Regions:
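The conserved Walker
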Residues: 8
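Short hydrophobic/aromatic beta-strand immediately N-terminal to the Walker A/P-loop
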Residues: 2-3, 46
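Conserved lysine of the Walker
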Residues: 12
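Conserved P-loop NTPase nucleotide-binding/switch module
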Residues: 60-67, 132-158, 181-186
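Phosphate-binding/switch region of NTP-binding enzymes
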Residues: 148-202
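Cytosolic-facing regulatory segments adjacent to core modules
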Residues: 25-123, 137
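Hydrophobic positions on the alpha1 helix immediately C-terminal to the Walker A/P-loop
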Residues: 15, 19, 57
């Protein structure tokens, strides 16, 4: 379980999207004569976006890969060369093992069920969750204490990483405390509802 933390607007999603794209873009498997996988490069990625819709995320990836601003893409203001770039980039993205799930307010149990299905149907070697604080604990464990809820979520993600034997990158918000200090470098204690996050993450 890897935690990628930052204050809002600092580029957590952009970095996570980049990691996911780059891992998926180089994915390939080497097999022996019996068809057994002997080596794997890159990753089959499950991106669980609780903040942005799949469409927003895809537009962001497409804009970055085609080197055309997402504003231009949204408005459809594309020249012929721009359009060709977009078509090329979208074909490239479509062929990648990058699966986006934008179900809002997912519980750990819901995420686990989706990840298991993804692994069974397509294969899965990396999970990205954007972001931790938007997840909900399982309905049976709805608690009044948010710290305990986050603890249940991080423990669930850690267990999922072990069960499926895949790394889980979970994005997390930092508290405002980091902005009050002269030294703005984040510390583990700046993680929102921090105790369990620093305890459960690798």
């Amino acid at each position: 379980l890897i935690i990628l933390a930052g204050r809002p607007g600092m580029g957590k999603t952009a970095l996570a999207t980049n990691i996911a794209y780059n891992a998926a873009s180089v994915f390939r498997q080497e097999k022996d004569e019996h068809g057994n996988v002997t080596a794997e490069h890159g990753a089959q990625v499950g991106f669980f976006s609780l903040e942005m819709s799949a469409e927003q995320l895809a537009t962001r990836i497409l804009a970055e890969r085609s080197e055309i601003s997402s504003e231009k893409l949204r408005r459809g203001e594309l020249s012929d060369p721009d359009f060709s770039k977009v078509v090329r980039a979208s074909q490239e993205i479509e062929s990648m093992p990058l699966y986006i799930d934008d179900t809002p307010a997912l519980t750990v149990a819901g995420l686990r069920a989706r990840a298991r299905r993804l692994k069974r149907q397509h294969g899965l070697s990396l999970i990205v969750v954007d972001y931790l604080q938007l997840m909900r604990p399982s309905s049976s464990a709805r608690l009044n204490n948010r710290v305990q809820e986050v603890s249940e979520i991080t423990q669930g993600l850690k267990a999922l990483a072990k069960e499926l034997n895949v790394p889980v990158i979970a994005l997390s918000q930092l508290s405002r405390a980091v902005e009050q200090r002269d030294d703005k470098r984040p510390q583990l204690s700046d993680l929102r509802e921090s105790g369990s996050i620093e305890q459960d993450s690798d």
